[in-house]
């Protein structure tokens, strides 16, 4: 078997570049990562110079995004196999899964990466097939449809800090967000049910637009809760409403009380 394959990693998140590089070294130690870059233009230059067999491309990158880069690569005589690194939901991914070399959904699990490597190896063994450009064009057309503005893509994970450490938190683990003066606190349930507090620099106003409104409700100007994590709702004698997330009691503004009608 030919083990001399090469690849590049393009992602604007240093933590994700490092994580993918480290994970690839474990599941495919023979693969040579010839470049790790932060945007599409750097990736294009690295690909033209090193002509790798595989390109791991984040779809959302500054300067030149992954999809635009793929269109440019498709004009090359021998384009690399592309593995898109994406935050798309599973239902959207299935629409183009058969045409892509593969995709990786953030945050990337080792088991999923192992499957990706096996699929890529199989595709590499069939290199030179006449329909490679046709498959790439079909993939790009479907990606353009999936990334159209009318199809909202909500956050699946959040990068947050805890002290000097950076963490990737699945939004499904988040209990609630609480705005402070210069940052937003993220309270998430980790491990054996222990609640951990993390910090993010994104404003609550910006964050709420990136969250699924069916899963997260802004109950107050300073707090957003995950609906499925609410244990109870009550009012005091003065008519003030509160929601409980575990043992935490959060106020509900009068404007937001209508969210709980019928509950």
From Swiss-Prot:
- What residue stretches are annotated with the HTH LytTR-type domain? 158-263
GO molecular function terms here?
phosphorelay response regulator activity; transcription cis-regulatory region binding
Report domain Response regulatory positions.
Answer: 6-121
Out of the domains of life, which is the source?
Answer: Bacteria
The opening ranks of the lineage are:
Bacteria, Pseudomonadati, Pseudomonadota, Gammaproteobacteria, Vibrionales
Q: Where are the transmembrane segments?
A: none
Q: Which InterPro entries match?
A: CheY-like_superfamily (IPR011006), LytTR_DNA-bd_dom (IPR007492), Sig_transdc_resp-reg_receiver (IPR001789), WalR-like (IPR039420)
Q: Which residues carry this modification: 4-aspartylphosphate?
A: 58
Please cite one Gene Ontology biological process associated with this protein.
Answer: regulation of DNA-templated transcription
GO cellular component, as recorded: cytosol; protein-DNA complex
Q: Which CDD domains match?
A: REC_LytTR_AlgR-like
* Protein name as catalogued: Uncharacterized response regulatory protein VPA0021
Query: Keywords for this entry?
Result: DNA-binding, Phosphoprotein, Transcription, Transcription regulation, Two-component regulatory system
